[in-house]
């Protein structure tokens, strides 16, 4: 199964147009991001402690919900 990080990278953009693209660009630069994780709780805890680049955890929640629908439910 594709990790959340791998899924999120499809939203990277040199000129981000939305919060998820900003999140994807920042996660790419975050060398400690749990790149192999598919677990909401693990990612959420990591971002609450280290995700100062997120303007709101709602951005993560929305991205993870899309990931859950598109990848995990297949």
Curated annotation (Swiss-Prot):
InterPro entries, per the entry: UPF0346, YozE_SAM-like, YozE_SAM-like_sf
Similarity annotation: Belongs to the UPF0346 family.
Annotated HAMAP family: UPF0346 (MF_01538)
Annotated NCBIfam families: PRK13672.1
Protein known as: UPF0346 protein BPUM_1890
Organism: Bacillus pumilus (strain SAFR-032)
Lineage summary: Bacteria, Bacillati, Bacillota, Bacilli, Bacillales
